[in-house]
Amino acid sequence: MMPIKSIVTLDQLEDSEYLFRIVSTVLPHLCLDYKVCDQLKTTFVHPFDVFLNNSLGSVTKQDELQAAISKLGINYLIDTTSRELKLFNVTLNAGNIDIINTPINISSETNPIINTHSFYDLPPFTQHLLNIRLTDTEYRARFIGGYIKPDGSDSMDVLAEKKYPDLNFDNTYLFNILYKDVINAPIKEFKAKIVNGVLSRQDFDNLIGVRQYITAQDQPRFDNTYAIADAARHYGVNLNTLPLPNVDLTTMPTYKHLIMYEQYFVDDYDRVPIYYNGNRVIFDDEIINFCISMRYQSLIPRLVEFFPDIPVNNNIVLHTRDPQNAAVNVTVGLPNMQFVDINRNNKFFINFFNLLAKEQRSTAIKVTKSMFWDGMDYEEYKSKNLQDMMFINSTCYVFGLYNHNNTTYCSILSDIISAEKTPIRVCLLPRVVGGKTVTDLISETLKSISSMTIREFPKKDKSSIMHIGLSETGFMRFFQLLRLMADKPHETAIKEVVMAYVGIKLGDKGSPYYIRKESYQDFIYLLFASMGFKVTTRRSIMGSNNISIISIRPRVTKQYIVTTLMKTSCSKNEAEKLITSAFDLLNFMVSVSDFRDYQSYRQYRNYCPRYFYAGSPEGEETIICDSEPISILDRIDTRGIFSAYTINEMMDTDIFSPENKAFKNNLSRFIESGDITGEDIFCAMPYNILDRIITNAGTCTVSIGDMLDNITTQSDCNMTNEITDMINASLKNTISKDNNMLVSQALDSVANHSKQKIGDLRQSSCKMALLFKNLATSIYTIERIFNAKVGDDVKASMLEKYKVFTDISMSLYKDLIAMENLKAMLYIIRRSGCRIDDAQITTDDLVKSYSLIRPKILSMINYYNEMSRGYFEHMKKNLNMTDGDSVSFDDE
């Protein structure tokens, strides 16, 4: 027996191998009409991954992604300016995201359940986030992932040792930070954006505002770094005529630029002295505390909500020196004013005040519940049926949230259960293959299979012309001539082949020789190659068919042939005569590409990639697509079967290994193209998998009796679409697919069969009526010729027996039609992907079945009744009964 830990599970597989397992093992156990939850058709991708690769955002909810980008911008600014957080392992620069190799600040309260999953199929930042989520606390993972709590109560407040400021408003911080075209300055925190080759006006105004507080010695370096002179000329600003800076705190028009200096430039450029009422302020911390308190006065109460321990006073003491350099301590106190002490943590609190100011003038972000973060309640997850459980666990990474020591952690759900912990919520991350979520691919595949009609399975080629108008002798002569044509100019080769054909055709007699299918491709290649066309052949396996694609360049058309012949000194009339004489050949050449197999040209391109091009431009070519079913012996791994010595070895053998291997290769090509669809998977699916899906799919059950009970008959219901609506309505409780075409086909089949059987019933009735007619003739003869009287009771008995015969015949006919209708109903249910759960079909079901189909065959029933009534009345008249009203013919 294989150890349990050595079993390969779906979450350990990736790409084509994973998708193959899903299609071959999970898909056959799903109802063909299985409806995938819309919330599972999208997944979560970290915004950093989307910034690096826009295509990754196609599998996410756009509103959820935009909300995460806004939230992540806030969290990143909080993290990078904080002295203690440092949770992000990246640095955002202009146009790129650099990964920091130093360890991030992981909490001491690590997850007690060890994570053993790597998630290599995920993008790098999403993979890193999952590793953090399964290692550290859930709260920190949500901070790094840009989580926003949704509206409503169906979410979980996670427990954490320490929580960080939670701000939520719409913003473009990440876009501004990652803006590519900026001035390459030593100070990376301030992004001086270049717009149309010049410093943006907003940044120019801010830099001019900061420049006034920089010393004269450092201003040239500052101007050179940010190209201030060029921007000033562009905006028509004369730097020499700028007003002198106001450096007194009591008269400054705004504290914005002094705060910006402290936030970005304090470490690189010296600042001019700052005064308060004419006295120079000694300590820089007091200057920034005063400026922040004055500029963000209205936001101080909001700040205290997040940091209740921060010192807030009604006044501030400024240590200053007067013009004589004497120390003067000034206590500043203003009515209804508070002063905050940011404890020398200037950059963080300046940044945080800016965030609060932005929050005040912005709208909050509203999001819905996220299956990745919020998930569902564990009890709700356990209440799902087995089919949903199997689908979710096969197509998604399944996580669980649980509490341990007053802290919320996230782990793989199976690991939580193995560790005997109690999950609170279950979170899902749908997997992505080839640029689409697996859940969405399965939904599309089921839809493609479910909408397939009988004519499409197996799909057949359209017929094509298989002769060139020559007899077998003439064809063989022409074939030998083609083999001798070589190394001639294209125009000359076409003319010589056409003229050779015309010469053979003139003396040819006999019926056309039909080209054998096994020789068709060889003849096509030889014919067009001998005419100088560029012919390439590509072969592949698609589904359970060998696919051949012959490309002929340039494209073969009547006009092209005429033009080519005219280039070889033929007049237009001569060319037309040649074409008329060689009509069958040219008709064959032009029509070879008129038919298409069941795959589209785009899909053929994917299955049969081309690596070398020649001839006319792309698209100007004739494409011949040929499909041949693979023989059953070629589909089966006979070597593997016969090399197995034990039952276990035989069970482990993939019987349909050849076509399954081709299926995997096709899946790999689709995944590499990044444009895979459910229709592609369906068309590439081999018959051994498709047969299992058609046969086994559908775990939902339908009761014939219940369904017939739900169908309400109508007296005027004599149209197919009305019956269709009733059947669809009765099936809606179990399946959701629209079966209009399926029901119409089935009921029309019953109606046609009923018409055939009414003919049989009429013939048998006529034969039996002849017997009664002979009996009536005998009675007539006895009474008329022999003058013997036959009693009315004898005559009435004979007529009653005829009525019994017609009733029995009609009853048998009704039972036959009821059974045919039940067969149609079973066909509808089976084709809808469901199975029957009735133990047996009762006589009541037959009555209900007949009542359903009766409106469609009412005219035939009336015809039979009128025919039987006519026979009855004719016999009754000939019998000349004394009491004619003693017996009558009553139909239903």
From Swiss-Prot:
Modified how: The precursor is cleaved by OPG083 to give rise to the 62 kDa mature protein during virion maturation. Proteolytic cleavage of major core proteins OPG136, OPG129, and OPG098, which occurs at a late stage of core formation, is required for production of infectious mature virions (MV).
Keyword vocabulary terms for this entry: Virion
UniProt keyword annotation of DNA repair present: no
UniProt-recorded Gene Ontology molecular function terms: structural molecule activity
InterPro entries: Poxvirus_P4A (IPR005058)
Prodomain residues: 616-698
Family: Belongs to the orthopxvirus protein OPG136 family.
Record's protein name: Major core protein OPG136 precursor
Organism expressing this protein natively: Variola virus (isolate Human/India/Ind3/1967)
Lineage of producing organism: Viruses, Varidnaviria, Bamfordvirae, Nucleocytoviricota, Pokkesviricetes
